[in-house]
């Protein structure tokens, strides 16, 4: 009898030990799974931070003037918002082919508030910010290309404007109206070197015709891109 009783007790003890080991094993699996989830979550946060820091920023921000309900200068069938967008998109492609990350204030016919454009550039922490526009004059006599900067930014924006102006004139052979100072919103509210290039007068019939051709738009884009790269490589 004692032997049978001892065997029953041994079996019960063995079963309890097995249950205990099973519970311990399940607990350890739970802890391990929890730690893995925590690691994945922290890894996700780290990846998101890296993305925001390195990938969501941009080297260069391009601003195609006007857009949406704001057409800009509108002479006959030449609309400023359409021309500036085409030039900006071509410039973006050239700069990206050169290995730079480019952000655009707009990539289609969208209205963007003027004050939001420099805010966008500031969020991107870009090295430079370039706004592209077409010019106009009341009597139609205006002709040529000019680039603006603000003296509030010091020599950096002036140098950027010079490089863009020189390169665009070289690529287009347009009349050189030189660089000029102004306190436009996009110039003064951005935190980085900024320039605004007026690529020609829509009120001038010969320039208006040129500005609507793909070849001339490409020449302008090549000049703008070259000027930006020349400034960055200084």
Predicted ranges, named:
Residues 20-29, 46-50:
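Membrane-entry signal-anchor segments at the cytosolic-membrane interface
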Residues 131, 138-139, 180-234:
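Active-site-adjacent mobile loop/cap segments within catalytic or ligand-binding domains
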């Amino acid at each position: 009898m004692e032997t049978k009783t001892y065997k029953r007790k041994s079996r019960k003890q063995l079963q309890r030990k097995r249950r205990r080991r099973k519970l311990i094993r399940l607990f350890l699996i739970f802890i391990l799974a929890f730690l893995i989830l925590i690691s994945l979550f922290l890894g996700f946060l780290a990846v998101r931070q890296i993305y925001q820091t390195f990938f969501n920023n941009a080297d260069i921000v391009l601003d195609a003037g006007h857009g949406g309900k704001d057409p800009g200068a509108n002479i006959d069938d030449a609309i400023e918002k359409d021309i500036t967008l085409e030039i900006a998109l071509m410039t973006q492609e050239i700069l990206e082919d050169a290995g730079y990350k480019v952000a655009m204030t707009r990539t289609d016919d969208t209205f963007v508030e003027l004050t939001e454009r420099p805010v966008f550039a500031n969020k991107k922490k870009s090295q430079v910010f370039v706004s592209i526009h077409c010019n106009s004059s009341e009597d139609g006599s205006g002709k040529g290309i000019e680039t603006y900067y603000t003296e509030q930014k010091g020599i950096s924006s002036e140098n950027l404007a010079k490089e863009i102006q020189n390169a665009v004139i070289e690529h287009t052979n347009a009349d050189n109206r030189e660089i000029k100072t102004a306190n436009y919103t996009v110039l003064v509210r951005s935190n980085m070197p900024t320039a605004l290039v007026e690529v020609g007068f829509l009120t001038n019939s010969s320039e208006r015709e040129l500005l609507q051709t793909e070849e001339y738009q490409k020449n302008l884009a090549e000049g703008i891109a070259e000027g930006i790269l020349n400034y960055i490589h200084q």
